[in-house]
């Protein structure tokens, strides 16, 4: 997590300074377009681990062999599909996005490089699925972190020290590291897994393919929703307004994506926990888990929102100061887009807890359909506002925030209250009101800090945010946490004997 966040803070300003606003925009566009290609695995990647865990626990190695061989067969078919689509995109990508003469050929060859790299990588994804199935999450996360670290070091060396401006070199680095890490995962499972991992065509059965698809299609809908939500909007911005604006629109999304990872890390276990409680018919525990999880997530998302609104503009000027392409108007637009997006983010992210819990109690199809519908609504609204009004990028940002509003206000809280038998008034009082009190105190502190400290430099901005964090943490402790939660917190930090009151 730390390496990923560090990478997210270091790489964008470095590449923006090296490649320029247009060059970085081309890189982002290629990334968003090729992000759709993994859809061709039809959700298989997300289901392999579950089946491996199931049949390995039963020591049913015949079924395990069928699942692995059938999954590999599907991955190989997907690779062929990726190659075909890449060959179609290759001559048309630069024309479609009206790339300038400087980036016309580069854009085409970059699409070819990334697309063929994905085709090679598809079958290698089986390694990650098997690692999940044999519960070697530690190794999987270690290898992923290693890949992120290697990518960071190479980009710093090539674009920071050697001042390269080549998008092709950047594509080679990104593709090679991804393939290398997946090769290492496959190498490990082929040598260390408790069963033999190999592809046998005779083990590819239609029944196994159907079994895999039965679990993977709901995950596929969720993937489609996420792609339409982020990549679809960024691609539309590049097509309708221009390549240079992609950078302005994508950077706030990137920052909020890293912010959502913090809550995702905390709530990652809610799905299996809900499944376990549902199996034992522990209704009170399900209520408590949902309310507590939403409250913690809202505490985090509200802090991110208030800090982003208060300090977004000076942060962007300090963070991206090395880029000579960004004007004062660009920095103002970055800050305004972030403000629009973060409002939706603050109210929507807490309900990720409900989506995980509902998925854990066999409501994954409901979650998938709602997520896809919300993404379609937000996408269409953003396009409409961008084309039919003078809002431009702000219109698309409103569409982005609308997705969170639909899921986080109109649908999932109501569904959670109904399914977990929680009174809406009690839900608001327990999950949302305490963080709002802490947030109100934070706003007052920010107002006072801005009266005293200038936030135009890192030396003054960092202490301001640190002070806000300390005050907010104290407010959360006294106004948001129950006595039981306080005791649990002290136990976590190693002071179990201290009275939390």
Regions found by a protein language model. Name each.
Residues 1-8, 147, 174-193, 205-276, ...:
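Transmembrane helical elements of multi-pass membrane transporters/channels
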Residues 1-54, 79-87, 117, 152, ...:
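Signature of the first transmembrane helix
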Residues 14-36, 67, 167-172, 207-216, ...:
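Interfacial/gating helices of multi-pass transporter permease domains
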Residues 16-18, 22-23, 134, 138, ...:
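Membrane-interface helix-loop junctions in multi-pass transport and translocation proteins
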Residues 42-58, 133, 194-195, 252, ...:
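Helix-loop junctions and terminal segments of transmembrane helices
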Residues 112, 339, 374-377, 426-483, ...:
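Transmembrane alpha-helical segments of multi-pass transport proteins
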Residues 119-146, 189, 342-376, 383, ...:
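Membrane-interface junctions at transmembrane-helix termini in multi-pass inner-membrane proteins
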Residues 168-171, 185-230, 281-284, 288, ...:
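Interhelical loop/hinge segments that connect adjacent transmembrane helices in multipass membrane
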């Amino acid at each position: 997590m730390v390496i990923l966040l560090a990478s997210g803070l270091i790489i964008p300003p470095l590449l923006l300074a090296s490649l320029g606003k247009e060059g970085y925009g081309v890189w982002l566009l290629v990334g968003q377009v090729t992000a759709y290609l993994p859809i061709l695995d039809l959700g298989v990647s997300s289901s392999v681990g579950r089946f491996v865990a199931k049949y390995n626990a039963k020591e049913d190695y015949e079924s395990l062999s069928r699942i692995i061989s059938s999954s590999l067969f599907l991955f190989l078919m997907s690779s062929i599909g990726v190659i075909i689509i890449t060959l179609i995109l290759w001559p048309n990508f630069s024309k479609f996005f009206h790339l300038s003469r400087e980036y016309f050929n580069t854009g085409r060859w970059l699409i070819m490089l990334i697309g063929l790299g994905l085709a090679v990588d598809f079958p290698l994804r089986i390694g990650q699925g098997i690692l999940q199935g044999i519960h070697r999450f530690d190794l999987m996360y270690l290898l992923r972190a290693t890949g992120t670290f290697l990518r960071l070091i190479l980009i710093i060396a090539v674009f920071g020290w050697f001042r390269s401006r080549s998008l092709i070199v950047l594509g080679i680095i990104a593709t090679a590291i991804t393939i290398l890490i997946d090769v290492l995962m496959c190498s490990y499972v082929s040598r260390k897994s408790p069963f033999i991992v190999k592809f046998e065509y005779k083990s590819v059965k239609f029944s196994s393919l159907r079994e895999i698809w039965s679990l993977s299609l709901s995950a596929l809908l969720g993937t489609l929703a996420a792609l339409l939500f982020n990549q679809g909007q960024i691609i539309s911005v590049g097509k309708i307004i221009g390549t240079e604006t992609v950078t302005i629109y994508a950077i706030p999304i990137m920052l909020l994506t890293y912010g959502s990872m913090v809550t995702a890390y905390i709530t990652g276990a809610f799905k299996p926990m809900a499944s376990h409680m549902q199996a034992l018919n522990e209704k009170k525990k399900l209520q408590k888990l949902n309310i507590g999880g939403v409250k913690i997530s809202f505490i985090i998302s509200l802090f991110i929102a208030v800090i982003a609104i208060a300090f977004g503009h000076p942060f962007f000027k300090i963070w991206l100061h090395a880029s000579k392409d960004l004007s004062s108007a660009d920095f103002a637009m970055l800050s305004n887009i972030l403000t629009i997006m973060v409002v939706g983010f603050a109210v929507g992210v807490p309900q990720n807890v409900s989506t995980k819990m509902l998925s854990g109690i066999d409501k994954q199809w409901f979650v998938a359909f709602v997520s896809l519908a919300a993404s379609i609504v937000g996408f269409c609204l953003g396009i409409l506002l961008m084309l039919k009004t003078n809002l431009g990028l702000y219109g698309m940002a409103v569409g982005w925030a609308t997705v969170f509003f639909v899921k986080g206000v109109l649908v999932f809280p109501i569904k959670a209250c109904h399914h977990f038998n929680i009174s809406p008034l009690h839900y608001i009082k327990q999950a949302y009101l305490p963080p709002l009190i802490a947030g109100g105190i934070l706003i007052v502190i920010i107002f006072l800090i801005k009266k005293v400290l200038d936030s135009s430099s890192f030396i003054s901005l960092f202490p301001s945010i640190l002070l806000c964090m300390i005050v907010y943490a104290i407010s959360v402790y006294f106004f948001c946490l129950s006595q039981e939660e306080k005791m649990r917190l002290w136990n976590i930090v190693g002071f179990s004997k201290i009275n939390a009151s």
